[in-house]
Amino acid sequence: MKLRGLYAITDSQLLTGKFLSYVEAALDGGVTLLQYRDKTGDDSRRLREATELLKLCERYKTRLIINDDAELAARLGVGVHLGQTDGSLPDARALLGHKAIVGATCHGQLELAEQAKADGATYVAFGRFFNSQTKPGAPAVPLDLIAQVRARVHLPIAVIGGITLENAPQLVEHGADLLAVVHGLFGAETPQEVTRRAKAFMALL
């Protein structure tokens, strides 16, 4: 599957009071994948918000990904992104079917990407590459890892961690396919600025 472009990731705290308006603004600017990420554990709210996002994604012809919840993804008929401690990738693939997008966090380890490919991943994700507000304690990953992954794991490569319009070009130059962005997109003051940033990120790829 060819995946290339902006991978927008929601943050419930960052988007308090402006969740749908900012997400729609991003979709209006152009988003390849949208990941719904909510770590609160409020299942009813998660289902409601994910359902609302799916409606928006269908309108804008964008693929929705659920973070760390294969059952919710299956319920909505969308993809899933799994961290290293968030359940079995083969089980998620079996649950969602062969056409679903299933992404895997690989931190900074090439071996994890090779295993993810063997387990049926659609794309592999690496990071953090820069200082991240979402996961400030995560270990840094060197830029040259991207080329190593590209040479050995022939899957789309998502990069994450403190990505902004200023530092994103070097990630693309090193071979990244998907720019996974949270604060660098949704930390804007207005929906119009979110749209502008989304367009600018997409123009890099």
Swiss-Prot record:
Any one of the GO BP annotations: thiamine diphosphate biosynthetic process
Cofactor(s) for this UniProt protein: Mg(2+)
EC number(s) on file: 2.5.1.3
InterPro entries, A to Z: Aldolase_TIM, ThiamineP_synth_sf, ThiamineP_synth_TenI, TMP_synthase
Amino acids binding Mg(2+): 68, 86
Gene Ontology MF annotations: magnesium ion binding; thiamine-phosphate diphosphorylase activity
Record-level GO cellular component terms: cytoplasm
General function of this protein: Condenses 4-methyl-5-(beta-hydroxyethyl)thiazole monophosphate (THZ-P) and 2-methyl-4-amino-5-hydroxymethyl pyrimidine pyrophosphate (HMP-PP) to form thiamine monophosphate (TMP).
HAMAP family: TMP_synthase (MF_00097)
Protein name: Thiamine-phosphate synthase
Protein's organism: Pseudomonas syringae pv. tomato (strain ATCC BAA-871 / DC3000)
Gene behind the chain: thiE
